[in-house]
From Swiss-Prot:
It comes from Sulfurovum sp. (strain NBC37-1). SUPFAM superfamilies: Ribulose-phoshate binding barrel (SSF51366). NCBIfam families: PRK00230.1 (NF001273), pyrF (TIGR01740). Belongs to the OMP decarboxylase family. Type 1 subfamily. The lineage of its organism: Bacteria, Pseudomonadati, Campylobacterota, Epsilonproteobacteria, Campylobacterales. This is Orotidine 5'-phosphate decarboxylase.
């Protein structure tokens, strides 16, 4: 299990200050929509300057026609990030096209597919997909696995079933982690680190419980200490 810290603060200055405070730890850093749209490639470079061993997850959730997604995936690969994601809803052709485009890279980033956003509850998910979260997430995961992706973004509650349906090596990255049972905020399907471990999560994503803590570095130390016991 490897910790992924969500850099979701309102400004580059705040996000970089958080990263600076964590530079002693070779954790993953999640860069999302707001940070990347606002701060772009220089922000990625600034993170790597703080700690070259930070691994960067670019959380842009690509969702478009296959060739457009593949074009974007190639540009992402050129940024030197370590992982990015696409929407599984884009379908098998899009997945295959993206992976074929990246096959020429000697060291390509990991590619994950988003199954069901953790902000969904069962009722709202069914209104869109006409199936339950568990069933559809597993279907999306099998499609992703069959088309050569490295893993999926899902909630902790789908992780074990997804690995059983695909492979133990098929990665699960799970937002909505409240390490010690902190407030859920706008997330619907949240879990503690202990549960994430039981459900074989590879990458727990933690944001607010870290950056809203009075001592973010201390919180990360607590989290890493707990992970080391698993």
């Amino acid at each position: 299990m490897e910790l992924c810290v969500a850099l979701d603060l309102p400004s580059a200055k705040e996000n970089l200050a958080l990263a600076e405070s964590l530079k002693a730890y070779n954790v993953w850093m999640k860069v999302g929509f707001r940070a990347y749209i606002r701060d772009g490639k220089p922000f990625i470079e600034a993170l790597k300057a703080i700690n070259p061993d930070f691994r960067i997850f670019l959380d842009l959730k690509l969702y478009d026609i296959p060739n457009t997604m593949a074009d974007a995936a190639e540009e992402i690969a050129k940024l030197g990030v370590d992982m990015f994601n696409i929407h599984a809803s884009a379908g098998a052709v899009a997945m295959k096209t993206v992976m074929e485009r990246l096959s020429s890279y000697e060291k390509r980033p990991l590619v994950l597919a988003v199954t069901a956003l953790t902000s969904f509850n069962e009722e709202n998910f069914r209104m869109i997909y006409e199936k339950g979260i568990d069933e559809k997430a597993e279907q999306f995961a099998r499609m992703s696995f069959e088309n050569g992706l490295d893993g999926v973004v899902c909630s902790t509650f789908e992780s074990r079933a997804i690995k059983n349906a695909t492979s133990d090596d098929f990665l699960t990255l799970c937002p909505g982690i409240r390490p010690f049972g902190e407030d859920a905020g706008d997330q619907q399907r949240v879990a503690t680190l202990e549960l994430a471990n039981e459900e074989r999560v590879d990458f727990p994503v933690v944001g607010r419980p870290i950056y809203k803590d009075s001592d973010p570095k201390g919180k990360v130390e607590e989290i890493l200490k707990l992970i080391s016991t698993f």
